Amino acid sequence: MEGTNGVSQARRYPVPWGLVLGLASHIRKGTRESVDRFSEAVVSRIDPPPRIEGVENLPPSPRFVLTANHFQRKGLWILFPAAVLTQAIRRRYGALDPPVRWIVTANWPPLRIGPWRVPSPGDWLLPRVAHALWCYEVPFTGSDPARTARSLRRVLRDARSAGAPIGLFPEGVAGTAGIPNRPLPGVDRLLAHLARAGLPAQPVGIREDSALAFRIGRTIPPAELTAAPDAARLVMQRIGELMR
């Protein structure tokens, strides 16, 4: 998209507040939304439609870790790329709901009011939104090690009988559109544990030109992940190659 000065300008994708606020009853009752229906509605708001390459690289079984760069910027919430990937999995593997179980952050930075630091309302809200959308909420910042351990044990327990991919943005919220970042601390161990449970990693590179573009690469087998000095860095290297 070109601006008047010939410089490429990023498109803006308005936050789908109607859909987000529609989760309120689930948050209040502790119930869950259809991730298939929710993500389909999010994708329908993306204009122009996103491009997806390399679907043929997805493995025969949906039992894997779906990994991608955290493609978020001003005017583009990470919800949009996550929804596109969720619907791509839905189309490839059929009527799974949830098509993907994403691992999401469980805490926001504290608010600053003058010299004081106040816990963010997101600390209360995010775990409840995560539950409503079948996500695993994991605080990766080290703020609550016991809670992190409980969340990761749940991921690993479910991985043994997973019928759908586990979704992960290894960079976390520090990831910025178009700029590869280091994976979060602990992601290496998580990927290695999941690999030992038999889950390969499926790298996807997200980029943007005239539209959002998703490039699905070759699957990284469990043996390659467990043999790597750092499984998370290996995954991010493959993702970086797909972003070009």
Explain the meaning of each model-derived region:
Residues 1-100, 104-114, 120-138, 150-153:
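Membrane-anchoring hydrophobic helices of lipid-metabolizing enzymes
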